Amino acid sequence: GLHSAHFFQCAQVCQYMDKVTRLAEIMLPMLKDYGATTVVGPAMGGLVIGQEVARQLGLRFVFLEKVNDQLALRRNFKFVAGEKVLIVEDVITRGGRVVEALTQCRAHGAEPVAVGVIVDRSQGKTSFDVPHHSLAELSFPTYQADKLPPELQGSEAIKPGS
């Protein structure tokens, strides 16, 4: 994966449900008018915020989970053909998990209508084929492992969870 001097861990805020409730309240105006009947949260990051967005909108919530590092619809969750879904995630950096979520939803008959995220770290480099909204856009430089700047060379790469 990419390396950076900064890491934004949404799990630190998502452990406080009053904060999650407020973040979802702020996100609702961006997502409420798409006619969705279900919110989909990619594991792990989309679970807490996705469920709270669904609760506040009065919608069903399902999640996609990792199987062999790929998102999959499991636990007998099903979509009705053409069911309109919102994808809700905590952070996007390159957008790979959201693209996987969009693909999985379509493969199971759903129609994704929008994406909502707490933090967009993509620096404008992601684009999805549905509208996407974020509460915050943060721009931290990222680097390939073989192209680290001098100040990061020799530092230990850590991945506290993603």
Predicted feature locations:
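PRPP-associated nucleotide enzymes
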Residues: L2-S162
